[in-house]
């Protein structure tokens, strides 16, 4: 996260660190057995850490899991930059709530343009040169009109299941290594960090976030055991 500050240790109990030897992403615990992240975060030999703040410290209530099963949009195992960049992971066993671990609510409605939301992760805090922090950084950004992103990125369709979010004048943004992590509005997960400009936090180049509200039925169906459900068309 560019332009943010170290997150408060108590404000990210739902934040998961997805890690393999050469790759990291964020994720969000949405109940004791399920983590929501981005499809492009799929990696082999993935470990999922919960209850972590400083990655170089071992916490008493830290819990490590691995995926029992990963679910993608069946309508297309393919995702692209503006479609279906979402993955639901069933953990090999449930996690226990603790001082540093608790799930985040799914959205009760879509977010409105102008809302101030919070993005967080262990991604780089500088761009284009990368500097990875030991602790997650948090920044407040705005839900922007989708047209701002259409103006910034050639090829974005007229409508998509993504949110455009950032700061128009630049300076605050998610960045490399934050992928899959949450965009939180009013205590609910509204977005999943998906993609953005090659250099992060540039003016008029906001980030794009998978719009979680559009996938609620898909998420809830899979958790309920209906694994043949398709993503929204």
From Swiss-Prot:
Gene3D superfamilies: Trypsin-like serine proteases (2.40.10.10). A motif (Cell attachment site) lies at residues 176-178. Glycans are attached at residues 54, 129, 226. Its EC number is 3.4.21.-. SUPFAM superfamilies: Trypsin-like serine proteases. It is found in: Secreted. Optimum pH is from 5.5 to 8.5. The active site is at 40 (charge relay system), 85 (charge relay system), 179 (charge relay system). Its main location: secreted. One of its GO terms (molecular function) is toxin activity. The fibrinolytic activity is completely inhibited by PMSF, diisopropylfluorophosphate (DFP), pefabloc, dithiothreitol (DTT) and Zn(2+), but not by Pepstatin A, E64, iodoacetate, chymostatin, tosyl-Lphenylalanine chloromethyl ketone (TPCK), soybean trypsin inhibitor (SBTI), phosphoramidon, Ca(2+), Co(2+), Cu(2+), Fe(2+), Mg(2+), Mn(2+), K(+), and Na(+). The record marks 77-78 as: Cleavage. Expressed by the venom gland. Belongs to the peptidase S1 family. Snake venom subfamily. Heterodimer of the brevinase A chain and the brevinase B chain. Is devoid of fibrinogen clotting and caseinolytic activities. This is Beta-fibrinogenase brevinase. It comes from Gloydius blomhoffii (Mamushi).
């Amino acid at each position: 996260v560019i332009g943010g500050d170290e997150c408060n240790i108590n404000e990210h109990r739902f934040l998961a660190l997805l890690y393999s030897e050469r790759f990291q992403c964020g994720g969000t615990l949405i109940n004791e057995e399920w983590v929501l992240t981005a499809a492009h975060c799929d990696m082999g030999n993935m470990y999922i850490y919960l209850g972590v703040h400083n990655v170089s410290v071992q916490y008493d209530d830290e819990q490590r899991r691995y995926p029992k099963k990963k679910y993608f949009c069946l309508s297309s195992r393919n995702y692209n930059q503006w479609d279906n960049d979402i993955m639901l992971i069933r953990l090999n066993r449930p996690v226990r709530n603790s001082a540093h671990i608790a799930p985040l609510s799914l959205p009760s409605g879509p977010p409105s343009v102008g809302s101030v939301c919070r993005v967080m992760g262990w991604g780089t805090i500088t761009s284009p040169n990368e500097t990875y922090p030991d602790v997650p950084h948090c920044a407040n950004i705005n839900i922007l009109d989708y047209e701002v992103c259409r103006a910034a990125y050639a090829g974005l369709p007229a409508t998509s299941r993504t949110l455009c979010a950032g700061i128009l004048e630049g300076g605050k943004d998610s960045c490399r290594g934050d992928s899959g992590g949450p965009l939180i509005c009013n205590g609910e997960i509204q977005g999943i960090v998906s993609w953005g400009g090659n250099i992060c936090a540039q003016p008029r180049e906001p980030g794009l976030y998978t719009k979680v509200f559009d996938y609620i039925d898909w998420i809830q169906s899979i958790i309920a055991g209906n694994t043949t459900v398709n993503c929204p068309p």
